[in-house]
Design a protein with these regions (language model features):
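Structural core segment of the AMP-binding/adenylate-forming
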Residues: 45-46, 73-148
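Conserved AMP-binding/adenylate-forming core of the ANL superfamily
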Residues: 16-61, 65-69, 86-91, 142-148
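A short N-terminal helical cap/helix-turn-helix that marks the beginning
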Residues: 1-19
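Domain-wide signal for the mature, well-folded portions of proteins, strongly enriched
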Residues: 12, 26-30, 94, 115-116, ...
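Conserved pre-ATP/AMP-binding loop-to-beta segment of ANL
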Residues: 15, 127, 143-144, 150-171
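Hydrophobic/aromatic residues within well-ordered alpha-helical segments
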Residues: 10, 35-36, 119, 166
Length: 171
C-alpha cells in the first residue's frame, strides 16, 4: 500500500465525490486522479526519473495536493518546502536536495528569485498562477505554467507504483 494506491482506490469507489474545494474551484476524486496522472505524464516527458527530486513551494492549493500524488507517480521524490523560509534557507534546500524541478506559486517570486541566485544546479521552474487571486503584481519565475504543463500530459499514462516500501516518495 502507498498513498498512490489509496488515491487510485478512492477514485474507483468515490469517483463523483468532491475531493478538493479551493476558492472557486472544486474537483471530484476522478478529476483529481486524472489531473495527477496527466501531471505525472508531463513530468515524465520533461525527463524526470525515478529517484529525482521535485521541490514544491506553494500554499494549500489544489496544485500542492496534486503534487503529493503526481510526483511519486513518476517515481520521483517530493520535497515540499515551507512557505515561511527565507531565501538563504530555500537555496540550501534546493541545492542539498538536488532538485531537478521546482513547482512554485508566483506569490513567492521574491523569495525564489533570490534563492535561485545561490543555486548551482539548473532547476526547471513551473509557475503556479493562482487564478483565484490577483497575480498582476507577481512576476513570472519560470518558463512553464502549471495548467499548461499539466495539459501536455497524457491521462492514460501508465504511472509507476513504488517497487517496495523502501522507495522514497517524499523528503
Amino acid at each position: 500500500l502507498s498513498p498512490l494506491t489509496f488515491l487510485e482506490r478512492t477514485k474507483d469507489i468515490y469517483p463523483n465525490y468532491e475531493a478538493v474545494v479551493y476558492e472557486s474551484r472544486s474537483y471530484t476524486w476522478n478529476e483529481v486522479y486524472k489531473r495527477c496522472v496527466k501531471f505525472a505524464s508531463a513530468l515524465d516527458k520533461l525527463g524526470v526519473k525515478i529517484g529525482d527530486t521535485v521541490s514544491v513551494m506553494a500554499f494549500n492549493t489544489p496544485e500542492i495536493f496534486e503534487a503529493h500524488y503526481s510526483i511519486p507517480m513518476v517515481g520521483a521524490v517530493i520535497n515540499a518546502i515551507n512557505t515561511r523560509l527565507d531565501p538563504k534557507t530555500v537555496s540550501y534546500i534546493l541545492e542539498h536536495s538536488d532538485a531537478k524541478v521546482l513547482i512554485v506559486d508566483r506569490q513567492f517570486h521574491e523569495v525564489i528569485t533570490k534563492a535561485l541566485k545561490n543555486v548551482k544546479n539548473k532547476i526547471i521552474i513551473i509557475d503556479i498562477d493562482d487564478r483565484d487571486i490577483d497575480t498582476s503584481t507577481f512576476k513570472k519565475i519560470g518558463e512553464l505554467e502549471y495548467e499548461s504543463f499539466l495539459s501536455s500530459g497524457d491521462e492514460n499514462y501508465e504511472w509507476k507504483k513504488p517497487k517496495d516500501e523502501w522507495q522514497a516518495i517524499s523528503l
